[in-house]
From Swiss-Prot:
<dbReference type="InterPro" id="IPR005467">
    <property type="entry name" value="His_kinase_dom"/>
</dbReference>
<keyword id="KW-0472">Membrane</keyword>
<dbReference type="InterPro" id="IPR036097">
    <property type="entry name" value="HisK_dim/P_sf"/>
</dbReference>
<keyword id="KW-0597">Phosphoprotein</keyword>
<feature type="compositionally biased region" description="Basic and acidic residues">
    <location>
        <begin position="526"/>
        <end position="535"/>
    </location>
</feature>
<feature type="modified residue" description="Phosphohistidine">
    <location>
        <position position="294"/>
    </location>
</feature>
<keyword id="KW-1003">Cell membrane</keyword>
<dbReference type="InterPro" id="IPR004358">
    <property type="entry name" value="Sig_transdc_His_kin-like_C"/>
</dbReference>
<keyword id="KW-1133">Transmembrane helix</keyword>
<dbReference type="InterPro" id="IPR003660">
    <property type="entry name" value="HAMP_dom"/>
</dbReference>
<feature type="topological domain" description="Extracellular">
    <location>
        <begin position="53"/>
        <end position="198"/>
    </location>
</feature>
<keyword id="KW-0067">ATP-binding</keyword>
<dbReference type="Pfam" id="PF02518">
    <property type="entry name" value="HATPase_c"/>
</dbReference>
<feature type="transmembrane region" description="Helical">
    <location>
        <begin position="31"/>
        <end position="52"/>
    </location>
</feature>
<dbReference type="GO" id="GO:0005886">
    <property type="term" value="C:plasma membrane"/>
</dbReference>
<protein>
    <recommendedName>
        <fullName>Signal transduction histidine-protein kinase AfsQ2</fullName>
        <ecNumber>2.7.13.3</ecNumber>
    </recommendedName>
</protein>
<dbReference type="InterPro" id="IPR036890">
    <property type="entry name" value="HATPase_C_sf"/>
</dbReference>
Amino acid sequence: MTREHQGGTRGLAAARKGFWSGLRFTSLRLRLVLVFGLVALTAAVSASGIAYWLNREAVLTRTQDAVLRDFEQEMQNRAGALPEHPTQDEVQHTAGQMANSSQRFSVLLVAENADGTAVYGSSGGLGGVALSDVPESLRTAVNKEQKLTSANKHPYHLYWQRITDDGTPYLVAGTKVIGGGPTGYMLKSLEPEAKDLNSLAWSLGIATALALLGSALLAQALATTVLKPVHRLGVAARRLGEGKLDTRLRVSGTDELADLSRTFNSAAENLEKRVADMAGREQASRRFVADMSHELRTPLTALTAVTEVLEEELEYAGEGEGEGGSFDPMVEPAVRLVVSETRRLNDLVENLMEVTRFDAGTARLVLDDVDVADQITACIDARAWLDAVDLDAERGVHARLDPRRLDVILANLIGNALKHGGSPVRVSVARADHEIVIRVRDNGPGIPEDVLPHVFDRFYKASASRPRSEGSGLGLSIALENAHIHGGEITAENAPEGGAVFTLRLPQDPSPPADEDGGPDEETEDRGKDAKGQV
């Protein structure tokens, strides 16, 4: 199969798929077309049936009346002129004359000769009408003498019947000559009338099909007209769901669909105002946090310097114990508390400033070639976690990352595992599809299912009763933002055998391809260049 043929086949398949998807059985368009079609079909079939029946009766009645009238006249004029006891030749000759009338029917005459024997005369000779061709019920009715009354002046009457022989319709009639004489039977083919009626039926069928097709096209046009505003409303609703809050519908008319469009526009406008108000409040709160963080940083720097001096004094006092320490034993716990809380406050302010950088979009990567195993070891060693962490990482796994931000991610993940899951914490490193995969698994009970979706939310705590010393609720959020700025991701789940597992995925080289002018990406900086954007 050639490529052009394949493309044409795919295009045809797509067109068929689009057609059937547009006419799916649950669609309003198809239901409208079906309803219009059924109504049109019912009306057309009813009208065609009535028209066919009326025309059929009119055609058959007109032909039948003309034939019967002519036959009755021929019976009185020609058959009535026969002698009382005619011969075979006389009867045969009269039947032939009667058959040559304007209506051209076949005739059978039955008379009695002088010795009482029945004499038959057929217009077609031996191949003409036989008495056996006449239904017995008709012969009985013709030969039955009626009682004479004031309303019935003659003992015998004309009777007729429609029959079908070998698929051809016939009109059969019979009567006796008034005043006495032979009995006559007439056979008239109705095949020309049947052909005319068949042509009429075909014409009515074609008209019905055309009416059905026209109604389907009309229904399609009406459905398009009716559903076009609904389609526009659906498109606008999807755009609104995608966050395009300025989406509005053009309203025209005063019908129900126009009212629906006005309601949508009003709801969209109110939603846009609410979202803008919420965004303004969020922006104001972020500015407040950023301003407060910067305002707190200056006095906190001085306070941190003082606490470092106090901490050194505590160390000297401990070394000089027995020779007269400089701290009162009652004051020493308070000093240690001040030092600890000052450090915690300093960490909180630094975390808040980090968050404000992410929100403002000013965070930058300072990339360097990093041995991942060495980086993890350095992170664990700097925090004295070597005895509580099992590291499964071979050396030589290199990636181009920001060492400081990777250290922040690892410190938060491992520290969180030690704090809430307990030791030993297992850290493993693997490579998969140009990615570095770092898994941190603790030895605790795992994360509750209702908490899992919120572990990376800012300031989220699983319980409001948790002690405030357990953290600010920003660590995992900052770790996730640092992973995102690398183009990576962090996921949290519970291991089947117990314990929580945090999986960090980072690309080995997060730098996007250089632009055509060779300029570096604005979101990253090389270690060898100016690093003033480092946070």
